[in-house]
UniProtKB/Swiss-Prot annotation:
Stated family: Belongs to the RNA methyltransferase RlmH family.
Protein name per the record: Ribosomal RNA large subunit methyltransferase H
Molecular function terms, GO-annotated: rRNA (pseudouridine-N3-)-methyltransferase activity
Residues noted as binding S-adenosyl-L-methionine in the record, renumbered to the chain: 94, 113-118
Length: 145
């Protein structure tokens, strides 16, 4: 399995970037995981870049209105989507205005991290942490805080 986190916007905040890098490193002990930052812009520009970043993958659009999943169901979903096709699962996070409608419509599934609205950079950290948690759950390992 390979995971891709494609997100609109750059993370410039050093502590936030450090936390993301910590969890990405932990995920990579289990599976390959790429993070792709896409420059923010109008939907006509962002949409094709997100599509290219997720080409050939099972695509999960991360949206407030998506399916709300607990950590166990999230892990099971990662495993299910990761076992299909090429074994690549791409998680897409939009910018301040969310994902372009055509990108959302083309996704294989839509998940939500919470009914709360998060700044997109914080949502990325929460997603990456949940991907690490999913890896530990799938292997029956205790979660390392």
């Amino acid at each position: 399995m390979r995971l891709v986190v494609a997100a609109v916007g750059r993370v410039k905040d050093k502590p936030l970037r450090a936390a993301m890098d910590e969890y990405l490193g932990r995920i990579r002990r289990y599976v390959a995981c790429d993070e792709i930052e896409i420059q923010d812009g109008p939907p006509a520009k962002v949409g094709p870049l997100l599509a290219r970043a997720s080409a050939g993958a099972s695509v999960i659009a991360m949206e407030v209105g998506g399916k709300a999943l607990g950590s166990e169901a999230f892990a099971a979903g990662v495993e299910r989507w990761g076992s299909r096709g090429k074994g690549v699962v791409a998680f897409l996070i939009g910018g301040a205005d969310g994902l372009p409608p055509d990108v959302s419509a083309a996704a294989d599934d839509r998940w939500s991290l919470s009914p709360l609205t998060f700044p997109h950079r914080l949502a990325r950290l929460v997603l990456i942490e949940q991907l690490y948690r999913a890896m530990t759950l799938l292997r029956g390992e205790p979660y390392a805080h």
